[in-house]
Amino acid sequence: MKLHLSALALGTTLLVGCASSGTDQQGRSDPLEGFNRTMYNFNFNVLDPYIVRPVAVAWRDYVPQPARNGLSNFTGNLEEPAVMVNYFLQGDPYQGMVHFTRFFLNTILGMGGFIDVAGMANPKLQRTEPHRFGSTLGHYGVGYGPYVQLPFYGSFTLRDDGGDMADGLYPVLSWLTWPMSVGKWTLEGIETRAQLLDSDGLLRQSSDPYIMVREAYFQRHDFIANGGELKPQENPNAQAIQDDLKDIDSE
């Protein structure tokens, strides 16, 4: 189960620092909010406390940290060729070559990617949030499409989650069988949940956890699509306010 809880860590910070201009921003929409809230309640109030969280606690407490790091490095290394292609598609050949170098060094010298040799050798080759095909679409202004909460999966939009399926067309991801892909997805989901166990209070303290999760999801993907930059939101009434101020000054 992939609940996209990693959005909370970055998204909560962004929500504090950025104003939001509504769910229609950058193609955001939530036409199925009633259904989504029902699925959210199932995912986060039934599935998470009784299945996902206990597994994540056991993973954190009993799996050695070096083993967790190695598995995370390995699954991340599988995505490096697709990330490289997406940077080229976004017109950023420098970052594309950075990820080519990461894949080459970590695969050859890092035991197939279990050791992040590249990141240890050069700070400029540190592992970063992967740019998937959904991020490329966002880079060119493609809207998210309807937001949906899926059972056992969590937050989903056609652009970022559906678009990411295109990454599976590139090696090494294209070489994975269906069971291998499920195993990768499961490992990533458990590791993400384990990393956020200490942040559970964020949701419990929120007046509307569903809105918090939804907006954190959008903020996180906006941040990635914008190349790690926070773009100020334009006030739709800014021009009218400026005109009023000019009228006052002219009097």
Specify the residue positions occupied by each region the protein language model found.
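Positively charged n-region of N-terminal signal peptides that target proteins for export
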Residues: M1-L5
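Bacterial N-terminal signal peptides
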Residues: S6-V16
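Bacterial Sec signal peptide processing site at the extreme N-terminus
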Residues: L14-F35
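Post-signal-peptide N-terminal segment of Sec-exported extracytoplasmic proteins
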Residues: P31-Q65
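Beta-rich strand-turn-strand
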Residues: L71-F74
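Mid-length scaffold segments of soluble, non-membrane domains
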Residues: N77-L158
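A structured, mid-to-C-terminal "fold-capping" secondary-structure block
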Residues: H131, S135-E251
